[in-house]
Curated annotation (Swiss-Prot):
ATP binds at G36, A37, S38, G39, S40, G41, K42, S43. This is Phosphonates import ATP-binding protein PhnC 3. Belongs to the ABC transporter superfamily. Phosphonates importer (TC 3.A.1.9.1) family. It is a peripheral membrane protein. The keyword Ion transport does not apply. Keywords: ATP-binding, Cell inner membrane, Cell membrane, Membrane, Nucleotide-binding, Phosphonate transport, Plasmid, Translocase, Transport.
């Protein structure tokens, strides 16, 4: 077991409960999809896993004994946690290679980051681009790439961190179906080959059923399903989506999050 969440709860200012007593385990090489309606708590869960939000109650333990509320453990955890965003968060005027190299900055001091990175880091970045099928685009500016290619650069950047955990927050929401399948296929293959625990939030049930080893359904901050993709049926989907309220936790301004300290 790599990560354990025990009775995790998050309450935002005003008393809005984004997560309620969530207990989950995640294992190396496991490809998990979090399904839920907008405002169900999916993104809050991912932010907790990355240490960006401090839970109101409960614990997050990695490697069986280290809790990420310890600042030193949290720093090490973030260093080895790759994050893939819905809006890829790339630097448009830079090349694909330059963007992927930013994934290596966590391994260098702030002062060192102002200077060219070592050749070893460039080799790692090029290998990551090759693994997502974009080695030939290494020197292309990312604003000249398609949306699907840009998201694959985002995967390569996260992979350059040499992560043990990969988090993806609605990574294909803005892509067409063909690009969505390609992006998730690359991500799943890489994580399984490298033994990386992958946790991805999605809206698309068809993609979850096609690629997930495990699906976790969340509704109003509570876990309502946890099982294999083959086990999820219409009744489970009704439990996940049928009772969602029109509350969008992801729209709460970031300055109102219960943010964790560095």
């Amino acid at each position: 077991m790599m990560i354990q969440l025990e009775c995790l709860s998050v309450t935002y200012p005003g008393g809005v409960q984004a997560l309620q007593a969530v207990s989950l385990n995640f294992n190396p090489g496991e490809f998990t999809v979090i399904l839920g309606a907008s405002g169900s708590g999916k993104s809050t869960l991912l932010r907790c896993l990355n240490g960006l939000i401090q839970p109101t109650a409960g614990t997050i333990t990695i490697e069986g004994y280290r809790q990420i509320n310890d600042p030193k453990v949290l720093h090490q955890h973030r260093q080895r946690t790759g994050m893939i965003f819905q809006q890829h968060q790339l630097i448009a005027r830079q090349t694909a290679l330059q963007n992927v190299l930013t994934g290596r900055l966590a391994y260098h001091s702030t002062v060192r980051s102002f200077f060219p990175l070592p050749k070893a880091d460039k080799y790692i970045a090029l290998e990551c681009l090759d693994r997502v099928g974009l080695l030939s685009k290494a020197l292309a500016r990312v604003d000249n790439l398609s949306g699907g290619q840009q998201q694959r650069v985002g995967i390569a950047r996260a992979l350059a961190q040499q992560p043990r955990l990969m988090l993806a927050d609605e990574p294909v929401a803005s892509l067409d179906p063909a690009s969505s399948h390609k992006v998730i296929s690359f991500l799943r293959q890489i994580c399984q080959e490298d033994g990386i625990a992958a946790i991805m939030s999605l809206h698309q049930v068809d993609l979850a059923k096609a690629y997930a080893d495990r699906i976790v359904g969340i509704s109003q901050g509570r876990i309502v399903f946890d099982g294999s993709a083959a086990d999820i049926e219409e009744c489970e989907l009704n439990r996940i989506y049928g009772n969602a309220e029109n509350i969008h936790f992801d729209d709460i301004p970031s300055n109102q999050y219960p943010i964790a300290s560095n």
